[in-house]
Every structure is written in C-alpha cells, then in structure tokens.
C-alpha cells in the first residue's frame, strides 16, 4: 500500500500551493509561463541556450560571474531551457561546460523533479537522450512530483513520475529501449502505485500505448520475474488489465486479452482460442473485471461486456445461474407486492358513525377501525401476517439497497 506520509505530503503540497495561489488554475499557469519567458529573455545564459548560441554559452560558462545553477520561474536551469527548445548543440555545450546540470531537477511546486532527461524523452529527441545518458544521466532515480504532472480531473497530462513512463507515453520505441538498457526499472511505481503499463492504459493515443505495452512487457519478460508485469497491482489493487476495464479502454483491454489467449487450432477462416479468465471472472475475486464494470460509473466501460471472452462469460453465467436467480427474485418480489396490495385493499375499515363530524364537501362513508377492533376475526389475523411480511420485506429491501 502507499505510505501515509507520502499521501499526507502530497495533500499538504496541494493545499499550500492553492492557498499561496488563490487565482484560478489556468490563470496561474498563464502567469507562470509568462514569467518563464521573461526570465529567459533577462538571464543571458538562458537566452543563449534558447537561441542555441554555442559560442556565447561557452564564453558565459568561462565567466566567473555566471551562476550555472541559476533558476527560472519553473525552477529550471539553463540546460532545461536548451532541452525544452530541442537545441542539441547548446545542450551539449552546457553538459560539457557544466556537467553538474545533467541530473538537476526543476524545483518549482508545479514542475518539481523534472530533469532534462524527462524533457528529452517526451520531446522524442533521441540524440539528446543519447548524449544525456552517455554523460551520466540518471534514468532510474529521478521522480516528477510537481502538481502539473499529477493525475487530476481536468488535467492535461499524466505521465507518471519516472523517466521510463515518460518515454513510454511518448511512444518512441528506440528511446524506450535506450532508457531500459541504461538501467531503468520496468516495474517502477509512482505515488499511486501505477507502473508504466497502468499509465499507458490511461493515455488517449491507444495505438501507441499498445505498442509501448508490448515492448515493455517483452523487456520485462527477459528478467524472468515471478509475477508478469501486467499482473502487478497499483495501490488500489488494480492491475493494468483491471484498470483498462474500469476506465472503459476497450482497445487496451482487448489488446491485453489477446496477449493472454492461446490458439488451440486454426483451419482456414476458423480459429479456436482458449482465453485466460483470471481477473475477469468474479469467482473468488471481489475486484474482478465484471465487478468493476457493473459497480463502476463509466458508461463506456459497459462496452467491454461486448468484448470476447467477457460476452461469452456473461452469457454462460446468465444461462447457468443468472436467469434462475432472476426468476426467483422476480417471483418473491411479485409475491411481496401482491401481499402488500392485498393488505392495503383489505385494510380495517368500518361505517362512519352517525355523530361523525363532516363538512358539506366531505363524502366520507367509512373510517379506520381502532387498534382493538382491527385484529378480531380470522381474516384480520391473515391480514396481520401480510402486514408483518410487508414490513419485514421493506426492511430487507432497504438493507439490500444500502449494502449495494
């Protein structure tokens, strides 16, 4: 499970940031990026890094008054600026002249933890990635914890924390392989416990995500782990497979299903497949795919019920158990409603007494019997049984609804 201090620290950071920045999120972002541009134009080293002016960068680095660790509005260094602008020559000059910047993270609340390598892999600049790694760029340790990259409602992106997950979301297979070869763990998890596969399931470009899933799973299989990567749960107990079902990502779900199937035989257009129902069937799994679909609020998740083998499994369960269970409940409910209706129809009434006070508009001819008059005859006792059944049935229905 996720550590409590980590969650408290995340919540406190968000609360502190919102108290310090009482403006709207979008307005605050606009102001921050305007300040970022202003800093670039005012700080000579930043400006030359943005303009890719190698000669000026070398002169500035040789100047004693130049602070190579100077930060901008985003907490960025000059190397971050060069990498964000995809300026290879400027970035190489900065790495050669100030190698201390290679693993320096951004320090602002928004971009906390972003290293130049994070930016290079997202921009898919393979040459920059190669230069950063060959000069000692750390691919395993850096973690992005800035609020801009947190998963939230209305968020623009969620790439996780680690460099590998950033590379996976970008979808460049050469960069993914390069990062893994440099020592990145395929099983690293972010503050939600999400691995790179979880994060890929949440990406909008499903085709690229599926290709990255295949590559990362293939590289992870080389390590001969006891548990396959696609069965590693996050801190909410969801594997990438279950997360795809919960989010209604049909493409990723079908892709992961197909990776688990076994072809029995093939004859022309006919193919017989065996499907692994682990994580799908609700038998012995309280958080199965079926449970997540039925209990979730995502409408698009219902579409997964049409995907093989979920459709066949639901049909089989309905024919074997569901329809009989439904018919039994329907019968019990009809009996309950019938009993309740009869109790209402034969409620204890008597003729209105002669001294019954009524207005000219009141046409009442029968009134409710007193309690002692209501339960005298055999018919009254039968009605009493029906009333007890009605009350108990109402409590049972209430308890069932509350439990669900």
Across the structure, where does each feature detected by a protein language model lie?
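Conserved ankyrin/ankyrin-like repeat signature
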Residues: 55-56, 89-90, 127-128, 174-175, ...
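Hydrophobic alpha-helical transmembrane segments corresponding to the first two to three helices
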Residues: 309-404
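Intrinsically disordered, low-complexity cytosolic terminal tails
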Residues: 1-45, 55, 147-150, 154
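Ankyrin repeat A-helix N-terminal signature
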Residues: 47-52, 81-87, 119-125, 166-172, ...
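Ankyrin repeat domain, specifically the short helix-to-loop turn at the C-terminus of the second helix
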Residues: 30, 59-66, 92-103, 130-148, ...
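Soluble extramembrane regions of membrane proteins in the secretory/endomembrane system
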Residues: 166, 189-191, 196-209, 217, ...
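Extended, low-complexity, polar regulatory segments
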Residues: 257-260, 264-319, 354-366
């Amino acid at each position: 499970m996720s550590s409590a201090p980590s969650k408290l620290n995340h919540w406190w950071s968000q609360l502190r940031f919102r108290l310090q920045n009482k403006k709207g999120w979008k307005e605050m972002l606009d102001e921050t990026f305007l300040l970022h541009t202003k800093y670039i134009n005012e700080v000579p080293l930043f400006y030359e890094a943005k303009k890719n002016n190698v000669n000026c960068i070398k002169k500035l680095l040789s100047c004693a008054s130049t602070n190579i660790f100077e930060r901008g509005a985003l907490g960025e260094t000059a190397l971050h600026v060069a990498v964000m602008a995809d300026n290879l020559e400027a970035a190489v000059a900065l790495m050669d002249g100030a190698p201390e910047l290679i693993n320096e993270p951004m320090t602002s609340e928004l971009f906390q933890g972003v290293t130049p390598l994070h930016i290079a892999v997202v921009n898919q600049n393979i040459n920059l990635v190669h230069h950063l790694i060959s000069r000692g760029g750390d691919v395993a340790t850096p973690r992005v914890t800035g609020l801009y990259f947190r998963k939230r409602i209305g968020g623009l992106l969620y790439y996780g924390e680690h460099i590998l997950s950033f590379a996976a979301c970008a979808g460049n297979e050469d960069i993914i392989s390069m990062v893994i070869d440099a020592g990145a763990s395929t099983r690293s998890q972010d503050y939600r416990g999400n691995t790179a596969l979880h994060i890929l399931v949440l990406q909008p470009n499903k085709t690229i995500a599926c290709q990255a899933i295949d590559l990362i799973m293939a590289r992870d299989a080389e390590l001969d782990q006891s548990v396959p990567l696609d069965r590693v749960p996050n801190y909410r107990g969801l594997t990438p497979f279950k997360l795809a079902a919960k989010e209604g990502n049909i493409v990723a779900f079908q892709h992961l299903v197909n990776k688990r199937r076994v072809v029995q035989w093939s004859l022309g257009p006919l193919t017989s497949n065996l499907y692994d129902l682990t994580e799908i069937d609700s038998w012995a799994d309280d958080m199965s795919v079926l449970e997540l679909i039925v209990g979730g609020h995502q409408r698009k998740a219902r579409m997964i019920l049409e995907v093989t083998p979920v459709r066949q499994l639901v049909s089989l369960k309905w024919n074997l158990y569901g329809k009989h269970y439904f018919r039994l409940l329907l019968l019990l409910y009809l009996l309950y409603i019938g009993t309740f209706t009869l109790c209402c129809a034969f409620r204890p009434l008597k003729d209105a007494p002669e001294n019954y006070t009524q207005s000219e508009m009141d046409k009442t001819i029968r009134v409710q019997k007193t309690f002692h008059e209501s339960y005298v005859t055999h018919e009254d006792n039968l009605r009493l049984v029906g009333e007890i059944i009605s009350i108990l049935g109402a409590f049972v229905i209430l308890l069932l609804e509350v439990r669900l």
